[in-house]
UniProtKB/Swiss-Prot annotation:
<comment type="similarity">
    <text>Belongs to the cysteine-rich repeat secretory protein family.</text>
</comment>
<dbReference type="Pfam" id="PF01657">
    <property type="entry name" value="Stress-antifung"/>
</dbReference>
<dbReference type="InterPro" id="IPR038408">
    <property type="entry name" value="GNK2_sf"/>
</dbReference>
<feature type="domain" description="Gnk2-homologous 2">
    <location>
        <begin position="135"/>
        <end position="248"/>
    </location>
</feature>
<dbReference type="InterPro" id="IPR002902">
    <property type="entry name" value="GNK2"/>
</dbReference>
<feature type="signal peptide">
    <location>
        <begin position="1"/>
        <end position="24"/>
    </location>
</feature>
<feature type="domain" description="Gnk2-homologous 1">
    <location>
        <begin position="27"/>
        <end position="129"/>
    </location>
</feature>
<dbReference type="GO" id="GO:0005576">
    <property type="term" value="C:extracellular region"/>
</dbReference>
<keyword id="KW-0677">Repeat</keyword>
<keyword id="KW-0732">Signal</keyword>
<protein>
    <recommendedName>
        <fullName>Putative cysteine-rich repeat secretory protein 5</fullName>
    </recommendedName>
</protein>
<keyword id="KW-0964">Secreted</keyword>
């Protein structure tokens, strides 16, 4: 089996193996394909793309990050995946497999593709993106309608926490999961107390300086959209920031107020 039949066989295998999980995740994905740079059906570019994505799928069961390259210029393909550092290997592999399926469904003949889900990032391109920080695209997911009664105090607490985590992450390139820091803090303020759980992570191909640059971009976007939200997730192509606060526990002298919550997703 050669040529286009091989490419469709790979896509069908992915479809039947992972379609159920992918359908449940599709609405939570940012899918970014090149719009005009299509490739021909017989191009060796597609074979190299299939090789890279297959390699990434296989490696996703043994680690939270990998990159791969296949082919010679001008048909070289570069690819990578990055799973959230708090995922186990099975969850990472499931996410990479489902995200790869989405690439085949949405970007089959495109020269580059990027998919960001809640749990992982998968991409490929004909241009090397290794070691680079990119400010677009990015995605923000956050709750609305459930902010604290003292948003300025909370925003200050959150940004101070993220500053500390970014510093720790930039110094952790040699850890088993590089550039990943996960932390929880109990916070008390006027209307009550809550637990603040925050996480920052960079792709291991970045150096410490570029890791910091990427995370600062994420904080900047967070500050502009959702630093008062109950939870938020900011994803760039090489880094991510997430946080969540527990239900407010009123102080003895304060009154508890129940508020509704919804989800907002913004993509740029």
């Amino acid at each position: 089996m050669t040529g286009i039949n091989t490419h469709f066989a790979v896509a069908l295998f992915c479809f039947f193996s992972f379609s159920l999980r992918a359908m449940s995740q599709a609405s939570q994905m940012l899918i970014d394909c090149t719009q005009f740079d299509n490739v021909t059906r017989t191009s060796s570019y597609l074979s190299n793309r299939d090789t890279v994505l297959s390699t990434l799928r296989n490696r996703s069961s043994i680690g939270s990050y990998s990159n791969a390259t296949a082919g010679l210029s001008p048909n070289t393909i570069y690819g990578m995946f990055l799973c959230r550092g708090d995922l186990n290997r099975t969850s990472c592999s499931d996410c990479v497999n489902a995200t790869t399926l989405e690439i085949y469904k949405s970007c089959f003949y495109r020269k580059s593709a990027l998919v960001i889900s809640n749990e992982c990032i998968v991409r490929y391109s004909n241009v090397s993106f290794f070691t680079l920080v990119e400010d677009v695209p990015s995605t923000a997911r956050f709750s609305t309608g459930n902010s604290l009664d003292s948003p300025q105090f909370f925003s200050q607490t959150l940004l101070e926490k993220l500053d500390a985590l970014i510093l720790r992450a930039s110094l952790s390139s040699s850890l088993p999961v590089p550039y990943f820091v996960d932390d929880q803090q109990h916070v008390t303020q006027l209307e009550g107390s809550y637990d603040l759980h925050a996480m920052v992570q960079c792709s291991p191909d970045l150096d410490p300086r570029n890791c910091t640059v990427c995370l600062r971009l994420a904080v900047q976007r967070l500050s502009g959209c959702c630093s008062h939200a109950q939870f938020a997730r900011i994803f760039y192509t090489k880094c991510l920031i997430t946080y969540e606060i527990s239900a407010l526990q009123p102080n003895v002298t304060s009154l508890g107020v129940t508020k509704s919550e919804s989800l907002t997703v913004y993509i740029i």
